[in-house]
A protein has these predicted regions:
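Conserved P-loop/Walker A NTP-binding site and adjacent catalytic elements of P-loop NTPases
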Residues: 1-199
């Protein structure tokens, strides 16, 4: 889908819906459910901020309907994350962790990181076209397999890109060559206004 079309929020919707339903039903536990991986630290910070508004809107609607409050917590974990925030994540894991491929690897190598990530259900890899074809992609593919082994369940894996072709190859990268997956391609084609002028 094209840039600015809401791919990232759409990717989060099912996971957020599950968290809200669980929260209403019996309250949310302090467990990480979603890991969002971005190739850029700046994008990670933007995503966390961009999630705050929809989550606040959901909480306001729950209050209006007289339903229990569901406080979905998000935190960024990159190389720039202050030690105080890292300690906070260890004490009380966020429901959504926003990170980079390198920081995901580091989390998977520490006991506290593995404990936090063991409850993961969904992984969202944004701007996958920027990661897949290089060493970072190979590194991330290994981290995704390690995360799935740690979680002990099939993870929902979502890859997002505005430009990736062929999509099938990226699907294999994200899920493994033999895994079943669904590819959603909006088929967006930009209109072109071309003219040929001969002198």
């Amino acid at each position: 889908a094209p840039t600015g079309s809401g791919k990232t929020l759409a990717a989060f919707l099912a996971a957020i819906d599950t968290l809200v339903c669980e929260g209403i039903e019996h309250g949310l536990t302090d467990e990480t459910h979603v890991v969002y991986v971005s190739p850029l630290k700046a994008l990670s910070n933007d995503i966390q901020k961009n999630l705050e508004l929809p989550i606040a809107g959901i909480r306001a609607e729950l209050e209006r309907l007289g339903l229990p409050d569901v406080d979905i917590r998000t935190m960024v974990r990159t190389g720039d994350t202050p030690q105080a925030d890292r300690a906070s994540m260890r004490r009380r894991p966020p429901h959504i962790v926003v990170t980079t491929p390198e920081s995901l690897y580091i989390l998977l190598t520490s006991a506290s990181g593995r404990k936090m990530l063991a409850t993961t259900r969904t992984v969202i890899v944004d701007e996958i076209h920027a990661i897949a074809p290089n060493k970072r992609g190979a590194h991330l593919a290994l981290s995704l397999e390690r995360l799935q082994a740690l979680a002990g369940r099939e993870l929902v894996r979502i890859g997002l890109s505005a430009t990736q072709k062929p999509i099938g190859e990226i699907a294999k990268f994200l899920t493994g060559a033999d895994a079943q997956c669904t590819i959603v391609d909006t088929g967006h084609i930009r209109e072109r206004d071309l003219a040929i002028e001969l002198p």
